[in-house]
Structure formats: structure tokens, C-alpha cells
Curated annotation (Swiss-Prot):
Gene3D superfamilies: FAD/NAD(P)-binding domain, GidA associated domain, C-terminal subdomain, tRNA uridine 5-carboxymethylaminomethyl modification enzyme MnmG/GidA. Its main location: cytoplasm. It comes from the Bacteria. This is tRNA uridine 5-carboxymethylaminomethyl modification enzyme MnmG. It is found in: Cytoplasm. NAD(+) binds at residues 273-287. It comes from Pseudomonas aeruginosa (strain ATCC 15692 / DSM 22644 / CIP 104116 / JCM 14847 / LMG 12228 / 1C / PRS 101 / PAO1). One of its GO terms (biological process) is tRNA wobble uridine modification.
Amino acid sequence: MDFPTRFDVIVIGGGHAGTEAALAAARMGVKTLLLTHNVETLGQMSCNPAIGGIGKSHLVKEIDALGGAMAEATDKGGIQFRILNSRKGPAVRATRAQADRVLYKAAIRHTLENQPNLWIFQQACDDLIVEQDQVRGVVTQMGLRFHADNVVLTTGTFLGGLIHIGLENYSGGRAGDPPSIALARRLRELPLRVGRLKTGTPPRIDGRSVDFSVMTEQPGDTPIPVMSFLGSKEQHPEQVSCWITHTNARTHEIIAANLDRSPMYSGVIEGIGPRYCPSIEDKIHRFADKESHQVFLEPEGLTTHELYPNGISTSLPFDVQLQIVRSIRGMENAHIVRPGYAIEYDFFDPRDLRYSLETKVIGGLFFAGQINGTTGYEEAGAQGLLAGANAALRSQGKDSWCPRRDEAYIGVLVDDLITLGTQEPYRMFTSRAEYRLILREDNADLRLTEKGRELGLVDDRRWAAFEAKREGIEREEQRLKSTWVRPNTPQGDAIAERFGTPLTHEYNLLNLLSRPEIDYAGLVEITGNAVDNPQVAEQVEIRTKYAGYIDRQQEEISRLRASEDTRLPVDIDYLGISGLSKEIQNKLNQARPETLGQASRIPGVTPAAISLLLIHLKKRASGRQLEQSA
């Protein structure tokens, strides 16, 4: 039967990509349906109970700047917060939070259930309705047909999911959930390139069976950071510690002796696993010279004894898992609550997508999250928001949007995926961004919130807070610029004594703040009139101290932008462009890049080839002008 309501956008899947996609589309005012196989698992953290980290927190802050839910849910569910790389420059500093699984999931569900324009329905999706290369809706497992011209697939690890524990395996989307077999079969019928990837998770431990007295305590930071630009530490629940222990020679012996029982090393698993989150058996094999590896025991929540032993993800048989766990100091008597496992699943080559995350072959069909070959909640959430927003824009008859590489880590993520593709689960790092001094986590709102407001993603509450912050920065910079300190005055002498910086003549406070040895807090302690908003103070200090470096990056971006944004016609015949080698012609013809900048990042496409493309575009434009004048 047909569902009586027609929708503008349908989102399949209620994980981190799906929830952000559905919320984004609904915030933009279009009628949105979120279809999930189980309402109770909306926003579930399937693997580690943490949000953020190097590169990842930048994505979370960008999601937040565009009105997304992940950061605010983290503030409501976060039970430990830390700033990573706190002694390094602001470009690579990152916020990381341990989250209570129950509180985080509850915060996401509350947001979903209170979002106007959003309907939630519990049914698995088994089929797509496609007519003349255009999606028209979906069909559920009980034959119910939902109609919409825009569908966002956020299927996670469920497509053809196969769970491995030792040499045994069974079908599953994750532990305790069924896989999506019918939809996987349907998608394989489409003219899209498909592959298999693998990820894994460690056994969960009962904290009552662990001896913490022989481990190293890792408390959170004080003062406690927040994840959202709208967040406050008053939102945080009780804060707890993590604990650090290590594997040892005995652990490594157990693993080495049982590699023949590993599905990874016996050839049972076809999919490639995440390079930057390897299983413990992979670590032992690849880094045989290392005597030990860190294991972080992370609490799963405030109302459970379960611990997540970060660092020992494994798919070895259960008896071996038990030996591994009990060989580690402090866990000699540990009880495993849930075994670790690996899961294989289908993903689709992201080079078959546009920047909007719409597939090139089926109009209105968008992919986001692990279906595109990424790993991580944050990467999924970022793609989900972008896909949901673009599905909404398409339903409104508007142009799609994707931030550039110099505007957001979301732009870096999407450009990497659709230009280069991926052979292994893709994880975000700050090192992937060329302009990371500009793409800091602290200024994500200044980069993106105005655009989010224009798109309809940002509500009045967030916009008011953003405007107050932006105006506060301008006011404080102006105040510092117009406040002067002279030598041989009480303030001048205090500055010289505190910072070891004698004043030789009159300086304004902004000049003084640009010096590396002078910090904002110390300066205003002497001169008075500190701002109340710590985000304003942080921005003023970073912008002042790094002004020269930031200006140089902006100049470089301006030089490159003209060619970067040059559009390539959809009907361009690369095979007919003389001067291009056959290899480059074939690469361009297969990739069909949307811009000159994207073409320049295709492996094997040389700067000389880009110059030839530019000449061809100019000739083509001139020829069309002559035709029109004739």
C-alpha cells in the first residue's frame, strides 16, 4: 500500500548520518521522513563511547555551526572532556569527550522528536522506487510505499553486514541488529561501483572485575571544555575518569599463537579495515617490534559498569579474547560482558557522487556515512548534514551547496572522497587540510553559521548567540586597538615585570597582544575590562597572534580560487582534447570532475594537463560567443 502522506525528503537510517540528515532537511522547512528499523536505536553509539578527537572535533564544531545536533548532545551526555594538543598551535587543538551512551542517545532522540517538519517511522527499507533514473520513493519490508523525489541513504554497516568472531560468522548489521540484505541486493543492481570494507570493536568489560589500583588514572580537564558553541559546563552530567593500562609480551604471544584462527589472517574477511583504528592482532602483526600497546578503559556511562577497552578491538575467537583480556595488568580477573567482533559491509565508491553527495546516475538519491567508505561518528554526521541539506535544496528547486576545502573540513572530506575515492575506511585528520590554520575548531561558527542561516539550517537562538559573539570580537579588538600603555607608568611597569617585556615607547594593547610572550588573560588582568565571553577572548587572542600567518593563507587561497572554482561543462569531451595523454583523457572521462580544482587533485592529472584544460575552456567559450554573434 501507499503511505497517505507524500514527503519532500526521506532519510533511511537513524545513526549519526541519518539523524543529522533528517534534522537538516526538516530545519530547512521541507516535509521529511526518517525511516529506521528500530526507533530505540536512534543516535546509538555503535562502537566507542566518545565524540571528537584530532580532526574529528573540527567536523563536530562545523556540524554545530550549521545547526546540527551532535555537539549539543555531547554536552548533555559527556562524562569526560579533554583538549588534545593543548600545548600546540590552535590549528591542531581538538576537543574530545567520553559520552554516556544512554544520555547521548536520549538527547538525540529528544531533538528528533521535537523537530518540526520531521516524521519518524519504524520499518526497514527493502527497495527503492526508481523511474527513468530518478528516485521516487522507497518500499519497506512489509511492502509499504513512501513517496518522495529525494532519498538519503545512511545505512552504516548494515548493507550485507556479516559479523565475524573467530572463524564463525553470521549476518548482522551490528551486534543484536539484523542486516539489510534486500536493500543491499537492490543497490548492487544500480550502475554504481561497490566494494566491501571492515571495521571492528573490542570486548566490553565489567568494571567491577577490574583492578584500577594498578592502572594510571586519566581525569578530564579543568576547567571543563564544552563541545557546542551554545554549550555550557552546567549542562554536563557527573564527570568521571578513564584508566590506562598496557598489553605486554604475554598478550602478544597469545595473539601470535592464534593468528591462524583470526578471520583477518585466514582469508575469511575480504573487506579492508581502518588503517588508523587497527585491531589488536593487526597491531601485533604490523608493529612486531613494539613491546606493548596502550589500552584505555573508557566508561560506557554513569548507570552501567561496562567499560570500553579502547585499543584491543579484535575478531579472534572468544576463548582467545578472554586470554588476551586477562593477560593485561589490572584485568587478570576481568569478566567480558560482550565479545568483540569484526563486521564486513558493502560500501559504494564515492567517486560516483557529486559534491552534493547525490549519486551521478540516479537523480535525487543521496549517500552519507559509511556507505561512502568513511569511518567515525563525526565523519558520518558531517556527511549526513550536507546530504540532508542538499536533498532539501533540491526539493526546493535551489542550487546545491558544499563548502570548499578552504572553508571547512566538511569540504575537505567531501572533496577527498569524490575526487580520490577510498580503498579503506576514511578518517579525518587535520593533516588532510591544506589551510588548517584557517579551519580551526574554535572559528567554525565564524566560517559557517552565516551560510547556515542563509540556507535555513540555523535557528534564531543560535543566530542571536553568533551575532553577539561576532560583535563582541569586533568591539574587543577595537577597544584593545584604542587603549594605549606608556612606559614608566604603573601599567607599563606591571607588564614589563609580568612578561619580561620592557616598553620602549607607547603601545596599544592589540600590538602588545601580538607578542608571543603576552597572553590575553594576563594582559587584561593588568589593564582591566576583560570580556565576559571566553569564546570572544579566545578569538581575539588567536586572530591577533596569528594575523600574519592567517593573512598569508588567505592570499594563497585568493590566488588559487579563480581556477579552483572554474566549472567544467557536464558535456565536455575529454577524449577529444588534443594534447592530453590517453591516460589522462581516460582518468578525466571516468571521474567527470565538476571543477578545475577537483580535476587537479585526480591522481596522475598533471599541472600541464590542467593548463590544457583551461585553454580548451577559453577556446570553447570564445567559439560560443562567435556563434551567438553570427
